[in-house]
Structures are given as structure tokens and as C-alpha cells.
Amino acid sequence: MFTINAEVRKEQGKGASRRLRHANKFPAIVYGGTEAPVAIELDHDKVMNMQAKPEFYSEVLTLAIDGKEVKVKVQAVQRHPYKPKLHHIDFVRA
């Protein structure tokens, strides 16, 4: 089972996403269920190591969003066109 630490994003938009990526983080979103969608930021290197395992895409993951645990599954992943970098992940609540 994977547990990923996340923080709620304070800023949104292209400029804010670029600043996150330069700080070795990247944006993501959690949606689904009865709760409102939540924009989050994740540590790039930690998630990159986890996503190398095939179970990352098929199992239920635990996101610790500012201390609150949420069960999610990966819905979509956006990657850099030629660098081994993640740009964005969509999570759906499990």
C-alpha cells in the first residue's frame, strides 16, 4: 500500500504550476464522491519512485492531505513529452 503526503494548493494557474515544478513538486487533483474537488501538490521525486511500480496504477492509494487521510485511485497521469518527469495526476476517491 502506498501513502503519499500532499498539501492543499494555495495558488492555481499556469504560473503557479510552473513555480511548483521548479520547486521539485507538481500539481494534482482529487475528485469524485460527494466531496468537492481538492487541488493538491505532491513531491515529485517520491511519487516518481512510487509510480515505477505497476501496483501504483491498480491499487487503492492513501493520500495524507494536511493530516487527513483519503483513499484514492489514479485516474490519469500527464508526463513531460521527453523528460522523465510528471506534470499532473488526477486521483478519484475510492
Swiss-Prot record:
Keyword Ribonucleoprotein recorded: yes
General function of this protein: This is one of the proteins that binds to the 5S RNA in the ribosome where it forms part of the central protuberance.
Coiled coil, from the record: none
GO cellular component: cytosolic large ribosomal subunit
MF GO annotations: 5S rRNA binding; structural constituent of ribosome
Keywords from the UniProt entry: Ribonucleoprotein, Ribosomal protein, RNA-binding, rRNA-binding
Organism: Cronobacter sakazakii (strain ATCC BAA-894) (Enterobacter sakazakii)
GO BP terms: translation
UniProt lineage: Bacteria, Pseudomonadati, Pseudomonadota, Gammaproteobacteria, Enterobacterales
Gene3D superfamilies, per database record: Ribosomal Protein L25, Chain P
Signal peptide: none
Protein name (Swiss-Prot/TrEMBL): Large ribosomal subunit protein bL25
NCBIfam families: PRK05943.1
Protein family per UniProt: Belongs to the bacterial ribosomal protein bL25 family.
Record InterPro entries: Rbsml_bL25/Gln-tRNA_synth_N, Ribosomal_bL25/Gln-tRNA_synth, Ribosomal_bL25_short, Ribosomal_L25_dom, Ribosomal_uL5_bac-type
Keyword Heme set for record: no
Record text on subunit structure and interactions: Part of the 50S ribosomal subunit; part of the 5S rRNA/L5/L18/L25 subcomplex. Contacts the 5S rRNA. Binds to the 5S rRNA independently of L5 and L18.
Recorded superkingdom: Bacteria
